[in-house]
Amino acid sequence: MTKHPPNRRGISFEVGAQLEARDRLKNWYPAHIEDIDYEEGKVLIHFKRWNHRYDEWFCWDSPYLRPLEKIQLRKEGLHEEDGSSEFQINEQVLACWSDCRFYPAKVTAVNKDGTYTVKFYDGVVQTVKHIHVKAFSKDQNIVGNARPKETDHKSLSSSPDKREKFKEQRKATVNVKKDKEDKPLKTEKRPKQPDKEGKLICSEKGKVSEKSLPKNEKEDKENISENDREYSGDAQVDKKPENDIVKSPQENLREPKRKRGRPPSIAPTAVDSNSQTLQPITLELRRRKISKGCEVPLKRPRLDKNSSQEKSKNYSENTDKDLSRRRSSRLSTNGTHEILDPDLVVSDLVDTDPLQDTLSSTKESEEGQLKSALEAGQVSSALTCHSFGDGSGAAGLELNCPSMGENTMKTEPTSPLVELQEISTVEVTNTFKKTDDFGSSNAPAVDLDHKFRCKVVDCLKFFRKAKLLHYHMKYFHGMEKSLEPEESPGKRHVQTRGPSASDKPSQETLTRKRVSASSPTTKDKEKNKEKKFKEFVRVKPKKKKKKKKKTKPECPCSEEISDTSQEPSPPKAFAVTRCGSSHKPGVHMSPQLHGPESGHHKGKVKALEEDNLSESSSESFLWSDDEYGQDVDVTTNPDEELDGDDRYDFEVVRCICEVQEENDFMIQCEECQCWQHGVCMGLLEENVPEKYTCYVCQDPPGQRPGFKYWYDKEWLSRGHMHGLAFLEENYSHQNAKKIVATHQLLGDVQRVIEVLHGLQLKMSILQSREHPDLPLWCQPWKQHSGEGRSHFRNIPVTDTRSKEEAPSYRTLNGAVEKPRPLALPLPRSVEESYITSEHCYQKPRAYYPAVEQKLVVETRGSALDDAVNPLHENGDDSLSPRLGWPLDQDRSKGDSDPKPGSPKVKEYVSKKALPEEAPARKLLDRGGEGLLSSQHQWQFNLLTHVESLQDEVTHRMDSIEKELDVLESWLDYTGELEPPEPLARLPQLKHCIKQLLMDLGKVQQIALCCST
């Protein structure tokens, strides 16, 4: 009896109709109807991109079938009721971004379905629903913690009333600040108190302005976006050279307040010390900030690119756009909290005497030691000038240089202009502050062995290594990136260029800052400005290179000189960052300093010798996106400064882990200049070899010469090729997925061919018992790998191996089966690299081109069973099918093929093999020849390995079939359920290939003409 299909909205019951169906795992997939059974009332559903063996019959009224697009029952009625759209084209609105926050945008189109096409303030165009668009209000806070910039200044009105209102608000703000200006002078005469009082002082100073100022500032910043056109041509332009040096610290102090949710006393505190010059500075700063853009979450790379471009216009043209883009992956630990706690910087600089008054009795005794150290330093300044990265020891002694000694114990309050200059200089030069931002300063001296402390409030954990702190922060506190661990002295002196890069709160270093900032001449301002820009454009501190370990101990006093001169030339910066910790003669007399705000001890001098190499074991995970978005001053590594910005485009990470990520300790090959993760290569900071070449440059056997340059073939891994400029559409960009999928498929086929070649060589050994390589199989395969090869499925050595002195093994590409002594196995450290690695992720399954030649076949099958038939005649026919090892167990251990040498497999062999070998054993016993018995065991071991490889080849062939299904689903056939006949398209294909060859010939001729 023929049934009629039901009338289901959105589903047409005909062959080829598109719909969605739910499989037995309760997942919904796009599918189409393959067949219809009108007798049973069922439809055969084919899930797209799945094999036809997964086709399933559904009743046509099944709830597990649904239309592709969800039915919008009320959409039409709602639109008819609405009538006109709420917003018009070119209207300024607030549109919801993917982070569920509203950002300024402009309506570019009103769609018929009730959606709006909007262009966000940073240029991103997106279609949003009407419920995600609301009216733009200039007086409201757009986002709680992230107030974006407003780029569409033309659409904002600038009425005279608002300008007058803005001026009145600004005058009121300045009056409040002037009332608070004398507060530091009054508090300087307070008696000595615990360090927590320093924080109270800082908060008291900004208490009044804390309530009134931030609101005014927010309104000012919103209003100034309307008036920046008028003010850009006013007197503020004339004062720009004078105030340029002040703008950046102000800017840095304000941005984190909103971005990180800092207390609102941060900006008022900074404003207190700058009150005299605030009025002209504020407008100029805000005008510049709006043109540069306040950072907004999730769009930070785009804004950073804009900020770097603006700075390039002001200073020089050599900044690359992708510096900002690659900045987050390159920046390391140093300087993570330079901007995070600006209130600490302000409290240190504004309260000169309170800074000293709040020092504990421990600090007094340390000052006495410093005075004696000062007298000794007058005799020999070179002896006591140390790199600033040396922790408190260096900080306590570096004051003794003659150039700095004159103002060592300076405690008199400075003028607001000088204090303003100090703030700017500290923000420009003190690029990395390594203070502990949380904690009290009256804590006892910490054990010198503990170098890394958890920065979470109320957590008192200390760690000896950066990676331990990293794990603690990630798994105990649930923070992906830790706040800022204290770094080893070696790391400090390598990564530091600022005057107090390690001891910002200490009084001595503060005095040094004052010396360099006490003469606010135009020349110094220009130098500071120039240096700030130079540090900004070099935003990519490189991971440690092996060479640094040998050349670090150079000219310990050069940083002192560079700090006072503020010259931004690359050689000087190189000298600054290369100051070595081994030249610190007065380490024993350097006191442990307490900063009034931190209270943690910076100098871990005792462990200096053992840690001067551990410079980057925790570099990458400390730069969060919030710091990345800010306009911070960062320095760069000396190797990078010498080489210039040209190096940025040519630095390549090529590691066996296949992860294009720069983190932790990295080492660079001296030949190919590629970087590898130290932990992946089994190298730590302590055991860096004198001469290092990567595994690729060592020309391992079986590797093609072009393998060294695989990383340059992005068109293979990403599918993007360079096209001709005059073409509007690039073919590779349109078909990138197809190119990549095809390349992966070819790579898998090539790997299977290589493994099959190795299997043929092994089976040639199995053909005769007199083969010279047969004794190499006296032990089962993988006898070696019981302990150390737990992740060895990803390491090249994949073929025959035994316990003898000269076992055979398959070469890197699996194609050569020439037995050789196992003299060059991969190091144990390499094998265990992902056990002890700091990478907190599982290694991705990468396709070709992979760095290491892993075995690409994984499970059972019988692709080459016919070739093994001669062996089945020898009595092994009962063994071969039954000794397919339980590969799932082995795979759970991380190995690609079974390990008959492991204890479980041995037990398995003893239980399984020996009873079933009974017929052959009887024959051998009759002959009484021990040689035949041993030969049979050798063949048995080899046969076991061959069968496991055959199984894996079959499994890989199944996966290749799936890949082919995916590629076939991308064919541009029209309407049919099956792809067109390939032979029908053969003439067209030939013609295309001929045309392509002709075009390539022309391109070759053009290239020859151009080269000659």
From Swiss-Prot:
Tissue specificity remark: Expressed in heart, kidney, liver, lung, pancreas, placenta, spleen and testis. Not expressed in brain, skeletal muscle, colon, ovary, prostate, small intestine and thymus. Expressed in colon and ovary cancer cell lines while it is not expressed in the respective normal tissues.
BP GO annotations: chromatin organization; positive regulation of DNA-templated transcription; regulation of transcription by RNA polymerase II
Entry remark concerning the domains of this protein: The Tudor domain 2 mediates reading of dimethyl-lysine residues.
Pfam family, one: PHF20_AT-hook
Cited Gene3D superfamilies: 2.30.30.140, Zinc/RING finger domain, C3HC4 (zinc finger)
Residues within the DNA-binding region(s): 257-269
Positions bearing Phosphoserine: S159, S488, S878, S880
UniProt-annotated location(s): Nucleus
Domain of life: Eukaryota
Positions bearing N6-acetyllysine: K843
Signal sequence residues: none
Organism this protein belongs to: Homo sapiens
Role according to the record: Methyllysine-binding protein, component of the MOF histone acetyltransferase protein complex. Not required for maintaining the global histone H4 'Lys-16' acetylation (H4K16ac) levels or locus specific histone acetylation, but instead works downstream in transcriptional regulation of MOF target genes. As part of the NSL complex it may be involved in acetylation of nucleosomal histone H4 on several lysine residues. Contributes to methyllysine-dependent p53/TP53 stabilization and up-regulation after DNA damage.
Effect of C100S: Abolishes homodimerization
Keywords noted in UniProt: Acetylation, Chromatin regulator, Disulfide bond, DNA-binding, Metal-binding, Nucleus, Phosphoprotein, Repeat, Transcription, Transcription regulation, Ubl conjugation, Zinc, Zinc-finger
One term under GO cellular component: cytosol
Name used for this protein in its record: PHD finger protein 20
Bilayer-crossing regions: none
Comp. bias regions, Basic and acidic residues: 147-245, 297-325, 481-490, 522-538, 888-912
ZnF PHD-type: positions: 654-700
Quaternary structure (record): Homodimer; disulfide-linked. Component of some MLL1/MLL complex, at least composed of the core components KMT2A/MLL1, ASH2L, HCFC1, WDR5 and RBBP5, as well as the facultative components BACC1, CHD8, E2F6, HSP70, INO80C, KANSL1, LAS1L, MAX, MCRS1, MGA, KAT8/MOF, PELP1, PHF20, PRP31, RING2, RUVB1/TIP49A, RUVB2/TIP49B, SENP3, TAF1, TAF4, TAF6, TAF7, TAF9 and TEX10. Component of the NSL complex at least composed of MOF/KAT8, KANSL1, KANSL2, KANSL3, MCRS1, PHF20, OGT1/OGT, WDR5 and HCFC1.
Region called Disordered, residue ranges: 142-336, 481-611, 866-912
